Amino acid sequence: MGLRPAKIDRDVDKPAYTRREYIRGAPGPKITIFDMGNLSAEFEYEVSLHAEQAMQIRQNALEAIRIQVNRYLQKNVGRSNYHFKIRVYPFQVLRENPMATGRKADRYGNGMRRPFGKPIGLAARVKKDQKILTVWVNEQHLKFALGAMHRAKMKLPYSAYYRIYDREGNDVTTKVLSTMKR
């Protein structure tokens, strides 16, 4: 069976379903690497992507974001000039009640009898204004970090915004963006 549209799973409307010891057949996470780039260096700026509203991000989208951002930064900045971290983990188990369709489907389908559903994937639950991912870079590579965040926003189910922080953790988004436009 194919992958369902993401709009089915993006809302946080059901209770959390995370206790894997009670779930038979729960799939494992597709995303395994959460830190990329130069993990030991100190960088001047932190660019973080925040969620504008509560949402669920499927593990397929997280893996696509990881591949896209990492590849873009490696190509434009170089492996030793950034640190990229995904800050959310897909704990939420997604379920689907497969419905039988077609001719004589009523003979072998259950319909809504026992409709709890089978596990089909995982998702990360994100609260409003929570950091989804972060890139640490120096000032000369800041525009590439912002480009990477723009590419990551396209793969999210709902809108997001980015913030730029200095080493002390102060929000310097407006100051940095005003100097970059000149």
Swiss-Prot record:
Keywords: Ribonucleoprotein, Ribosomal protein
Entry's Gene Ontology molecular function annotations: structural constituent of ribosome
GO CC, any one term: ribosome
Pfam family, one: Ribosomal_L16
Domain of life: Archaea
Biological-process GO terms, alphabetical: translation
Family according to the record: Belongs to the universal ribosomal protein uL16 family.
PANTHER family, per the entry: 60S RIBOSOMAL PROTEIN L10
The protein's name: Large ribosomal subunit protein uL16
Organism for this UniProt entry: Thermococcus gammatolerans (strain DSM 15229 / JCM 11827 / EJ3)
